[in-house]
């Protein structure tokens, strides 16, 4: 009886995991994944195939209108008949694997009846002439689990979205490796499959970021690997993502009548400065829209920086803000620093400004 209870609990946990692993593509449509990673494949092994499964969670039929591959090296087939509520459809792709011994990243652009924007699916992998040792293919080691890199990118997402991706990881040991994660950043989900990872084998590490209105612009999400119960605090996985406002549910008229900043200059010329000096750059703008303009976040690609507060700007009003760049940690020579504003403007949700100069 005890074993039966454990079996039922295990089955429930597995079912719960599988349900949570579904990726929401839009209102009423989910997928089992948006990225398929083939890992390392031999160049002479021939074509490789995968399948994406879509589930209709709405109360109306959904039609896959078209699936377009990013190159002629990938053939695609999909469910042509309407997908009824609660039912599933499939998109199958075959990569020719004849482009040479290189990494590949192919995109399938999917057009469906229920979603205005096209859905992007990815096929990834590395085609190799001869298999390399795991230690060489996955140079970043944390205990017995190995990665190609510890710096991952989840891309851009809008508020209300969940963005997912996946990479391959390896088990360097001669026995199965159980993998879990701790100290996981809020809004990040991360898991490995299969788990445990077979001895001297590979697995897919899937991760997803859920947009949160407390996080805007550039963000980092962290996770610490735990292998066979041992925590590895010496290194952590870092996942980058960029979050912007969502305007998908507003009309074209509302977009055109929304806030619209117009900057006097998009580039501040700092001229020649000495290394260690602080550059002070002021950017002025006018809100030519019909609603108040606001900035959710300012990101600056420099080691040491600060900026003044950007107060809400009413229609027709002018405003300005100042950015300070400490050049102590910047290399000598030409500099070009990007200042990125994440805003509430439907026409300019992202504004890039620049600080140019020369550091002696």
How would you label these PLM feature ranges?
Residues 280-288, 293-301, 305-344, 348-358:
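C-terminal soluble interaction/assembly domains
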Residues 28, 58-90, 174-202, 290-320:
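Surface-exposed binding patches on compact interaction domains or structured appendages
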Residues 91-99, 205-213, 321-329:
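Short, hydrophobic beta-strand segments
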Residues 57-60, 99, 114, 172-175, ...:
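Short, acidic/polar linear motifs in exposed loop/turn regions
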Residues 1-26:
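Bacterial Sec-dependent N-terminal signal peptides
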Residues 21-47, 53, 114-163, 172-173, ...:
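Long, low-complexity ectodomains and other extracytoplasmic segments of secretory-pathway proteins
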Residues 34, 45-51, 98-107, 159-166, ...:
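Short, solvent-exposed loop/turn segments enriched in Ser/Thr/Gly
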Residues 51-57, 166-172, 208, 282-286, ...:
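Short edge beta-strand/loop segments characteristic of extracellular beta-sandwich folds
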